[in-house]
Structure formats: C-alpha cells, structure tokens
Amino acid sequence: SESTSFSFTNFNPNQENLILQEDALVNSKGTLELTKNGKPVPESLGRNCTTLASFTTSFSFVMSAPNSLDVADGLAFFLAPPDTQPQKRGGFLGLFKDRKHDISYQSVAVEFDTYSNVWDPNTTHIGIDTNTIESKKITPFDMVYGEKILFASLVFPVSQDILPEYVRVGFSATTGLNEGVVETH
C-alpha cells in the first residue's frame, strides 16, 4: 500500500495547497489564526488508497479567551469532500449546515468543543463527528485557555463508507456570541 505524508512546520500565506477561507489568516509569526482576534461577531465562523486502514496526524494549537472564560465555539480537524465550502458558524464549527446526519456530506471531524450547544454534553469536550455535528464519541476535556500550547495526536480508522475517494484535510474554527481565539502552530 502507498502512503501519503505532508508536514507544515510553519505557515506562509502564499503556501501551496493552503486554502484560507472566511476569517482565517497567517500572522507575522507564521501561525495560522482560524478565528478573528477582536470583538466577537454574533454567529461567526489526499488521496484515496483502497486499502486505507487508518489516519494519523499531530498538531498543536492555542485557544484563548481575551475577555472572558465563557468561550465559544471551538476547533475541528476534519476530512471532507474536496469542494467543501464553509457552512454555518457558531456551534456548527463552520463544517455543517444543520444537526441532521447527512450521508451525502461524507466527513469525519475531531472537535475540541468549548461551548455546550443543545446537542452537546454540558462540558467542554473532544468529540468524533461523522457526517453530523452530533458527536458519535465524546470525551470530557478540561480546556486550557491562554498562551499554553496544546498538542493533539489523532489516530483513527477511516471507513470508505464514510469518506469519498478524495478528501480535503483541514482545520475549522468558529466563534459565536462568546469570543474565542484559535491558532494552530
């Protein structure tokens, strides 16, 4: 079987294969900022291998709450169809248009959720989302806000029943009425 690998040690706004959408930008430190750093806005926002058995990634990020400890809405690492466009903001993390399970939107996301929406547990958590924002698996997580860099390593099996032949790999983050700033490193 053939392996595909890529690594970003820092980011450049003119970098090949880096698609910045909505509020995302690369700052002067080479950090990818996924949400605006400022006043909150209401409701703001591979390759196929037929024997693919799992997907592995590692990344680091910072979540900060400049004006409050009540932060919304979170960060998601996702695999989705290549033509994926930003969806609803706020609790939908820019990935989904509603709460319905939609097999036509073949996607997998790992969310670092900082706000309890009506479909979420009443705690910050890490969730595994397949074709819907309603997590299939949830682990409570005490989110650390501020300048502390958090590290994530993800290993999970990928089903060809969930993902299309080609996918876009990316990050999405949104804020709602409560401000939050998300950076990946």
Swiss-Prot record:
PANTHER family assigned? CONCANAVALIN A-LIKE LECTIN FAMILY PROTEIN, LECTIN
Q: Can you name this protein?
A: Lectin B4
Q: How does it assemble?
A: Homo- or heterotetramer. V.villosa isolectins are composed of either two subunits a and two subunits B (A2B2), four subunits A (A4), or four subunits B (B4). The predominant form, isolectin B4, has no A1 erythrocyte agglutinating activity.
Question: Which keywords label this protein?
Answer: Calcium, Glycoprotein, Lectin, Manganese, Metal-binding
Q: Does the keyword Calcium apply?
A: yes
Q: Which GO terms describe its molecular function?
A: carbohydrate binding; metal ion binding
What does the entry list as the binding residues for Ca(2+)? 113, 115, 117, 120
What is the species listed in this Swiss-Prot or TrEMBL entry?
Answer: Vicia villosa
- Alphabetical list of InterPro entries matching this protein: ConA-like_dom_sf (IPR013320), Lectin_LegA_CS (IPR000985), Lectin_legB_Mn/Ca_BS (IPR019825), Legume_lectin_dom (IPR001220), Leguminous_Lectin (IPR050258)
Q: Which residues form a coiled coil?
A: none
Q: Which residues are glycosylated?
A: 48, 122
